[in-house]
Design a protein with these regions (language model features):
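Membrane-proximal soluble helical/coiled-coil segments
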Residues: 1-71, 77
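Alpha-helical adaptor scaffolds
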Residues: 2, 24-37, 104-105, 164-240
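Alpha-solenoid helical repeat scaffolds
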Residues: 24-30, 59-65, 80, 93-102, ...
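Structural motif corresponding to the intra-repeat A-B loop/turn of tetratricopeptide repeats
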Residues: 38, 72, 110-111, 145-146, ...
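C-terminal non-catalytic interaction modules
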Residues: 229-233, 237-275
Length: 275
C-alpha cells in the first residue's frame, strides 16, 4: 500500500472504531435509562460504571447518575454528581445551587450522632459549607444531637460575619434561623463570642433580634442587669412569637430573681399573650 493510501486506510479504521465505540456507549446509556425507568437504580449505576471515563462524565450520563443515585439513597454520590452537572452548566446557577443545597441538607439529616454529622460536614466542600442555609441547618442539627456548643458556634461564625455586615439581614427568615441556632448554643459562651454579639448589637441598636440575642447571651454569662436591659427593649419589638415569648419568660425569671413580683407578673402575662 502506498503511503498516502495507508494514511487514508488508517483514518477510515479509526473512524470505524470511533463509530463502534459511540454505538456501544449509546447502548449502555439506553440500558441505564431503561433500568432507571424500571426503578432499578443499582442496575442503572452498574451500566454507567461500565462506560469509559470520558463518556461517564457527559451531561446525559451524569443526569442519569444523579437520578439513580438519589433513587438508591446514595446521597453523597448524588451530591458529587450534582456539582459536576453544575460545572457543566447543565442547570441554571440558581437551580444548581438549590439542588446542591437540598442534597447537602439531606446528607446532614442522615447523621444520627455528632461524629456522623462531623463526617458529613467534612464531606461537603468549602463552597457548600459557606451557604447560610447549609451552615445553619448543620449547626441546628449538631445542637439537636447534643453536640458541643463551641463547635456549633464555630460552624456558624462565617454566616454570622456575613449577616452582621448586611443591615436588616437578621430580620429575614434566614437571619432568624441563625439567631435561633446561636441561641441553642449559648451554653458555655466564651468572652470572645459575647464581645462579637455585643459589638453587632451596638452597631445596630434598633435591631430587636440582636438585642434579644445579646440579652440571652448576657443571661448565660450571668450579667443579669445587662440581660434585663437588652430583653426589656427587645421583647415588645420582636415579630417572631417564639422569640418574643422566650424574651418575656426570661424577663419574668429575672424579675423573680430580684424579688420583683409586679414585674414578674407583668412579664409572665406578656409571655402568655405572645402569639
Amino acid at each position: 500500500v502506498e503511503l498516502p493510501e495507508l494514511h487514508v486506510f488508517q483514518r477510515q479504521a479509526r473512524a470505524r472504531r470511533h463509530g463502534t465505540q459511540e454505538l456501544l456507549e449509546g447502548a449502555q446509556l439506553r440500558a441505564a435509562r431503561w433500568s432507571l425507568d424500571d426503578r432499578d437504580a443499582e442496575g442503572a449505576l452498574e451500566r454507567l460504571a461500565e462506560l469509559p471515563q470520558g463518556a461517564a462524565r457527559r451531561t446525559l450520563a451524569l443526569r442519569i447518575r444523579l437520578k439513580a443515585s438519589r433513587l438508591a439513597g446514595r446521597t453523597r454520590e448524588a451530591l458529587d454528581t450534582a456539582r459536576l452537572l453544575g460545572k457543566h452548566r447543565a442547570f441554571s446557577s440558581d437551580a444548581a445551587r438549590s439542588l446542591v443545597r437540598g442534597l447537602a441538607i439531606e446528607l446532614l439529616n442522615q447523621a444520627h450522632d455528632p461524629a456522623q454529622l462531623q463526617a458529613a460536614w467534612l464531606a461537603l466542600d468549602a463552597q457548600d459549607r459557606a451557604m447560610p442555609d447549609i451552615a445553619v441547618h448543620a449547626a441546628q442539627r449538631l445542637a439537636l444531637l447534643g453536640g458541643d456548643g463551641a463547635q456549633v458556634r464555630q460552624w456558624l461564625l462565617p454566616v454570622w460575619q456575613q449577616a452582621v455586615e448586611l443591615p436588616g439581614a437578621l430580620a429575614q427568615p434566614q437571619g432568624q434561623r441563625l439567631i435561633a441556632a446561636l441561641e441553642s448554643a449559648l451554653a458555655g459562651l466564651d468572652a470572645a463570642w459575647l464581645a462579637r454579639i455585643e459589638a453587632a448589637q451596638q452597631a445596630n441598636p434598633r435591631d430587636a433580634h440582636l438585642q434579644y440575642l445579646a440579652g440571652m447571651a448576657c443571661v448565660q454569662r450571668q450579667l443579669w442587669g445587662k440581660a434585663q436591659q437588652q430583653l426589656t427593649q427587645a421583647a415588645p419589638q420582636l415579630q417572631d412569637a417564639g422569640l418574643q415569648r422566650r424574651a418575656w419568660r426570661t424577663l419574668a425569671e429575672l424579675a423573680e430573681r430580684r424579688n420583683d413580683a409586679a414585674a414578674a407578673a407583668h412579664a409572665w402575662k406578656q409571655a402568655a399573650l405572645a402569639h
